[in-house]
């Protein structure tokens, strides 16, 4: 949420920023309501002062017509104040609702552009691996090795759901555990395990509501919402709190499933697991002092890059232009990894600085020092990293001529030393193998 004073005192600046974002917001109505609200506040305060003065005067008047007239005037004042209070409450409610519709403003150094075509590639790391055999996309590898059961995922839950099988399910677990350990042990984050269902207030705090309700899963009976990212519950840990002096920065990391309706054009990304309704993600969230948030954004990007470098996956860092910024971000960098099978760059991390936009919505403040006036924190978040796209990148970059998939070296300790993923057994084969072993042991005895 923007500071109302910024809109009031610099409306042209806000309008110009919205123009760069290629979006609109109800600024005129906000300004009109703000002016009326200020008039009402002044009028109510004046009437209350008048009522207090008349109340003291009544105590000094003897019984008689003048006293009765003053009492009647007092009642009229009370009725007027009550009516104005009702109007003021309605205006404040409407004003708050309108302010929630205004996006964050881009930082001055964000490239200006109409859409993703205006994004700027900041740097590359690594070279795409040369292959001397035909490279397959991840969905072909998955089908040939029995790693993903697409048909049964659809049968269970509908389109864009899937079932990971065997070593790929294990690789996902290993990847999540390794990323969490890296962020905790080397990057200075504290792991948290938050709820996957949140209240409406939490979604409003991070900017997901009211604008993006159509993309969220919602239980109407309880008014609980399935999280689209761990950013929502983790950011709201400190909603309506004042953090004590010396408590910033705070670095938190969480691994959660994410749920999104992901309404996309028919025929787009229909193969594989690139765009799905349920996926896992490791999320980094920061609460920092305002004068440190620029530096902290660069550190956040570096933490996400470290994951990709250790996985030895070629990637690029892309700065979002004004036309491709999210609703809540003042500045955002995406990390895109190269997928040689599908011949495309896949976004596996978005790292954003929200400034005080989320903190105002969620009322998250801190005291710079003892006795100091509370200020809004700055919040940041970034994927570190998102699955299944990181799985896609591993499958396609580490595929071998014999059709197997090499396991990245950093993940092998989390896979019991396993080095490659091959053809997976049928659903019933592990149980049959156990039975055969038990029968063999029984025969030996």
Curated annotation (Swiss-Prot):
Compartments, record wording? Cytoplasm
Q: Which Pfam families match?
A: Seryl_tRNA_N, tRNA-synt_2b
Please provide the Gene Ontology terms (biological process) for this protein: selenocysteine biosynthetic process; seryl-tRNA aminoacylation
Keyword terms: Aminoacyl-tRNA synthetase, ATP-binding, Cytoplasm, Ligase, Nucleotide-binding, Protein biosynthesis
In the UniProt record, the signal sequence range is: none
In this chain, ATP is annotated as bound at 260-262, 276, 347-350
Classification via Gene3D superfamilies: Bira Bifunctional Protein, Domain 2, Serine-tRNA synthetase, tRNA binding domain
Q: Does the keyword Disulfide bond apply?
A: no
Query: What reaction gets catalysed by this protein?
Result: tRNA(Ser) + L-serine + ATP = L-seryl-tRNA(Ser) + AMP + diphosphate + H(+); tRNA(Sec) + L-serine + ATP = L-seryl-tRNA(Sec) + AMP + diphosphate + H(+)
Q: In which pathway does it act?
A: Aminoacyl-tRNA biosynthesis; selenocysteinyl-tRNA(Sec) biosynthesis; L-seryl-tRNA(Sec) from L-serine and tRNA(Sec): step 1/1
Q: Look up the record and report any one GO term of the cellular component aspect.
A: cytoplasm
Residues the entry annotates as binding L-serine? 229-231, 283, 383
Query: According to the UniProt entry, what is the EC number of this protein?
Result: 6.1.1.11
> Domain comment, in the record's words?
Consists of two distinct domains, a catalytic core and a N-terminal extension that is involved in tRNA binding.
Q: How does it assemble?
A: Homodimer. The tRNA molecule binds across the dimer.
Q: Which HAMAP family match?
A: Ser_tRNA_synth_type1
Name this polypeptide is given: Serine--tRNA ligase
The scientific name of the source species is Thermomicrobium roseum (strain ATCC 27502 / DSM 5159 / P-2)
Encoding gene (name): serS
């Amino acid at each position: 949420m923007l500071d109302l004073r910024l809109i009031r005192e610099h409306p042209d600046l806000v309008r110009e920023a919205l123009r760069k974002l290629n979006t609109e917001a109800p600024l005129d109505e906000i300004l009109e309501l703000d002016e009326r609200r200020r008039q009402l506040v002044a009028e109510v305060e004046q009437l209350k002062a008048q009522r207090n003065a008349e109340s003291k005067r009544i105590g000094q008047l003897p019984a008689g017509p003048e006293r009765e007239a003053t009492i009647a005037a007092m009642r009229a004042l009370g009725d007027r104040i009550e009516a104005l209070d009702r109007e003021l409450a309605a205006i404040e409610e409407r004003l708050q609702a309108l302010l929630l519709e205004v996006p964050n403003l881009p930082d001055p150094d964000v490239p200006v552009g109409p859409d993703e075509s205006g994004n700027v590639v900041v740097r590359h790391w690594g070279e795409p691996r040369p292959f001397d055999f035909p490279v397959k996309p991840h969905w072909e590898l998955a089908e040939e090795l029995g790693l993903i059961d697409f048909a049964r995922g659809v049968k269970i839950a509908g389109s864009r759901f899937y079932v990971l099988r065997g070593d790929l399910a294990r690789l996902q677990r290993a990847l999540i555990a390794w990323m969490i350990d890296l962020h905790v042990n080397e990057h200075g984050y504290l792991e948290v395990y938050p709820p996957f269902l949140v209240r409406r207030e939490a979604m409003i705090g991070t900017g997901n509501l009211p604008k993006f309700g159509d993309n969220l899963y919602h239980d109407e009976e309880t008014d609980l919402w399935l999280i689209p990212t761990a950013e929502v519950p983790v950011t709201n840990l400190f909603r309506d709190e004042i953090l004590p002096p010396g408590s910033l920065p705070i670095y938190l990391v969480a691994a959660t499933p994410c749920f999104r309706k992901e309404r996309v054009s028919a025929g787009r990304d229909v193969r594989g697991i690139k765009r799905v309704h349920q996926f896992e993600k490791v999320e980094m969230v920061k609460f920092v002092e305002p004068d440190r948030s620029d530096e902290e954004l660069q550190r956040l990007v570096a933490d996400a890059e470290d994951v990709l470098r250790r996985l030895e996956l070629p990637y690029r860092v892309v700065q979002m232009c004004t036309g491709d910024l999210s609703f809540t971000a003042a500045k955002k960098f995406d990390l895109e990894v190269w997928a040689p099978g599908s011949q495309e760059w896949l976004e596996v991390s978005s790292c954003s600085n929200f400034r005080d936009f989320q903190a105002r919505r969620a009322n998250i403040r801190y005291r710079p020092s003892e006795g100091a006036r509370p200020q809004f924190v700055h919040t940041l978040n970034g994927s570190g990293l998102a699955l299944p796209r990181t799985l896609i990148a591993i499958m396609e970059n580490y595929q071998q001529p014999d059709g197997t998939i090499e396991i990245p070296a950093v993940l092998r300790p989390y896979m019991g030393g396993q080095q490659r993923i091959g053809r997976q057994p049928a659903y019933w084969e592990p149980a049959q193998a156990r039975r055969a072993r038990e029968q063999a042991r029984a025969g030996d005895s």
